[in-house]
Swiss-Prot record:
The gene is gpt. It is found in: Cell inner membrane. One of its GO terms (biological process) is purine ribonucleoside salvage. It comes from Escherichia coli O127:H6 (strain E2348/69 / EPEC). Its main location: membrane. Belongs to the purine/pyrimidine phosphoribosyltransferase family. XGPT subfamily. SUPFAM superfamilies: PRTase-like (SSF53271). NCBIfam families: PRK09177.1. This is Xanthine-guanine phosphoribosyltransferase.
């Protein structure tokens, strides 16, 4: 990855609210399935904005920090996804998205961020990201002191 895109908590909340507004009316949804771990925080934000209490997870391992590896399903929510929103933080190459589509063919699959290779696999997303960009999510970062350039 040659570029980095830094996401702040404020940006994430703004994007999640924008996505939630597109998913109205909320009564059409039985619940949310968050893709662990990237979709957990966006899933909580959507659940709050839409007033949805039924939240489940599908746990898929596909990244080791910044290296993509073989998909492994650790836990899945039951059913075919009918009436459910499936949320992940991003769609990248589409590997996870293909697995999600196979597990939940009737779900409405959304992400906050989408890269070109995976974009056709989701029903909706908020932000376009170039394919060669690594996204730094706020839950992966800490706030640290940065000394002034002058050293004073």
């Amino acid at each position: 990855m040659s570029e980095k895109y830094i996401v702040t908590w404020d940006m994430l909340q703004i994007h999640a609210r924008k996505l939630a507004s597109r998913l109205m009316p909320s009564e059409q949804w039985k619940g949310i399935i968050a893709v662990s771990r990237g979709g957990l925080v966006p899933g909580a934000l959507l659940a709050r904005e839409l007033g949805i209490r039924h939240v489940d997870t599908v746990c898929i391992s596909s990244y080791d920090h910044d290296n993509q590896r073989e998909l492994k399903v650790l836990k899945r929510a039951e059913g075919d996804g009918e009436g459910f929103i499936v949320i992940d933080d991003l769609v990248d190459t589409g590997g996870t998205a293909v697995a999600i589509r196979e597990m939940y063919p009737k779900a409405h699959f959304v992400t906050i961020f989408a890269k070109p290779a995976g974009r056709p696999l989701v029903d909706d997303y908020v932000v376009d990201i170039p394919q060669n960009t690594w996204i730094e999510q706020p839950w992966d970062m800490g706030v640290v002191f940065v000394p002034p350039i002058s050293g004073r």
